[in-house]
């Protein structure tokens, strides 16, 4: 399992993934939720609330946050962003700011890597930009208690 996310962290990630300008479309969200086997019982709500409710329901049921990490990996697949690399870069930076609070970063190869845990907002905002993939070890599932 990956590190457990708090409700605030899940909400922040939902806001990023469902953002109007740089986030995913409603169709993309539907498809990725299906691919990740995350229940989608929130049709008709805003993208952000829909994602938060779906993530929270699945995470509570599974007693872990792996569904959120799976969704992020699927959403950030490089092939999805070939026609909009600026939006991808912005979204990856914002996602990594939240993940830095858990000592993780999603690198350009779409793999979670371990970084030093950020404990402040300023660290969380700086850490993803400066963590070198060559210095970090790949994050492994089932290594956190």
Outline where the language-model segments fall.
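Charged alpha-helical initiation segments
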Residues: 105-145
């Amino acid at each position: 399992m990956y590190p457990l996310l708090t409700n605030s962290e899940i909400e922040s990630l939902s806001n990023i993934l469902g953002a109007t300008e740089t986030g995913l479309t409603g169709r993309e969200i539907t498809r990725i939720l299906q691919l990740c086997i995350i229940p989608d019982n929130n049709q008709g709500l805003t993208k952000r609330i829909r994602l938060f409710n779906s993530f929270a329901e699945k995470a509570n049921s599974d007693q872990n946050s792996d569904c959120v990490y799976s969704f992020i990996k699927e959403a950030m697949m490089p092939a999805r962003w070939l026609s909009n690399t600026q939006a991808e870069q912005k979204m990856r930076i914002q996602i990594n700011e939240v993940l830095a609070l858990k000592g993780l970063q999603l690198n350009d190869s779409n793999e979670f890597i371990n970084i030093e845990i950020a404990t402040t907002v300023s660290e969380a905002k700086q850490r993803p930009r400066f963590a070198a993939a060559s210095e970090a070890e790949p994050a492994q599932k089932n290594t956190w208690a």
